[in-house]
Amino acid sequence: MEYIYAAMLLHTTGKEINEENVKSVLEAAGAEVDDARVKALIAALEDVDIEEAMETTAVAAAPAAAAAPAAAEEAEEEAEEEEEEEEAEEEAAAGLGALFG
């Protein structure tokens, strides 16, 4: 992912996305640079409109980000329901224990 981030950073700052610049960004970040991966990235991005790809990804990520809090809230509600059920079972078991002394 750091290779893609390097390319995105270069694009955002208006720098040319080439092997030398990608290597420089990665080295500045302290990452180990694999020349083959850098070359593959540059080749893969050759016909890609990065601006369009970033906008498309940002739009697709927005609904997913909005769904995350709802899913967390739902999981919390389920946990509360399970706790209530366990408490009810414990109370019922305690009541039965009193019957048999």
Swiss-Prot record:
Acidic residues compositional bias, start-end: 73-92
GO terms, biological process: translational elongation
Region (Disordered): 61-101
Molecular-function GO term, any one: structural constituent of ribosome
Pfam families: Ribosomal_60s (PF00428)
Alphabetized UniProt keyword annotations: Ribonucleoprotein, Ribosomal protein
UniProt feature, compositional bias: Low complexity: 61-72
Gene Ontology cellular component annotations, sorted alphabetically: ribonucleoprotein complex; ribosome
Highest taxon of the lineage: Archaea
Role played: Forms part of the ribosomal stalk, playing a central role in the interaction of the ribosome with GTP-bound translation factors.
Subunit-level organization: Part of the 50S ribosomal subunit. Homodimer, it forms part of the ribosomal stalk which helps the ribosome interact with GTP-bound translation factors. Forms a heptameric uL10/P0(P1)2(P1)2(P1)2 complex, where uL10/P0 forms an elongated spine to which the P1 dimers bind in a sequential fashion.
NCBIfam families: ribo_P1_arch
Family statement drawn from the similarity comment of this UniProt entry: Belongs to the eukaryotic ribosomal protein P1/P2 family.
UniProt-recorded name of the protein: Large ribosomal subunit protein P1
Gene from which the chain derives: rpl12
